[in-house]
């Protein structure tokens, strides 16, 4: 699990954020996307991975993962990063099916992400392209939260997800997959 000091500081900060809201959410959704590049305004959404969390922790059994169907092969260098090859993309789920399914799974839960504006922008474009209505609207950016909680680390230029994971001793089995 997360170190106790991180959990305590996150709870304090999140409680303050949601104090202004009508009710504190019971379910949060941690979201990550994989794309065909680094431009959220231009590049294609390849995969969405998400897992629910609540006051008791991460709920692995309450998760969502989808690889989207694409008709054209992606860039080989990009595939080397995220591992979603041409076969997986060709066998993926159509955007018009995936985005409504994701919306139904998220429901009214706020979304959490690292550099969440990227994921939010990519998902908004995908929802629009799928004719699936509005993408999830409530987001918390953990990169901004981490910088607010530890400005000294942010000022030193230690701003990547890997930097923050190292600070808190959090190990991850895989990176650069939407679910990992």
Each model region followed by its residue ranges:
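Short, Lys/Arg-enriched N-terminal segments with co-localized hydrophobic residues
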Residues: 1-4
């Amino acid at each position: 699990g997360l170190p106790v000091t991180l959990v305590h500081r996150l709870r304090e900060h999140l409680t303050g954020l949601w104090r202004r809201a009508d009710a504190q959410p019971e379910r949060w959704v941690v979201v990550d996307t994989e794309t065909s590049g680094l431009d959220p305004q231009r590049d294609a959404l390849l995969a969405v991975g998400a897992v629910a969390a609540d006051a008791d922790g991460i709920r692995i059994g309450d998760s969502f993962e989808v690889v989207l169907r694409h008709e054209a092969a992606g860039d080989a260098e990009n595939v080397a990063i995220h591992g979603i090859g041409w076969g997986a993309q060709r066998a993926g789920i159509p955007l018009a099916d995936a985005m409504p399914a994701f919306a139904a799974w998220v429901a009214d839960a706020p979304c959490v992400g690292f550099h969440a504006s990227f994921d939010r922008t990519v998902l908004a474009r995908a929802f629009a392209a799928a004719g699936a209505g509005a993408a999830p609207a409530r987001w918390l950016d953990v990169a901004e939260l981490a910088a607010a909680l530890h400005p000294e680390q942010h000022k030193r230029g230690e701003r990547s997800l890997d930097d923050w994971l190292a600070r808190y001793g959090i190990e991850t089995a895989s990176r650069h997959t939407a679910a990992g």
